[in-house]
Amino acid sequence: DENVFVDARDGNSYPIITIADQVWMGENLRYMPSVSGPGTLSDTDPKYYVYGYDGTDVAVAKALDYYSTYGVLYNWPAAVNACPSGWHIATDAEWTQLTNFAGGENAAGGKLKETGTVHWQAPNNGATDEYGFSALPTGFLKDNGTFMYVGQYGYWWTGTESGGNNT
């Protein structure tokens, strides 16, 4: 199917969506060659995390609902190597182009996020998922090793360098 990408590294498949002239994966990446607990932070070594999991067994982590629904949380060294061949982390300019196409900063969030309250906390007002991007509230791993905000907020890396240490 031309609207599905299969990652040859692990067999995970992802819907492909086109918004304006940009091509995006329609789900969060699930590539995870290893897994770390939230207390195992690093600015230099790749670390892969599954929200709420505090272990190192990849098979156990992949069996969790969070993994199959929300994907993997990556620190920066993992994020830069997680993309399959032919894909890249969107730059700040690409995110800005997407945001502008979706109506600007005040409107884009609703147009790009999943509708309903299965994954987003109620009331999730304004969510239309107009383009099939289906953004999910993955939360993040704070730089003190605390998982935060699943169900409330979604965060994505940009390929454009800036400060910050959260995953």
PLM regions: where:
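Conserved positions within compact, well-structured domain cores
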Residues: D1-T167
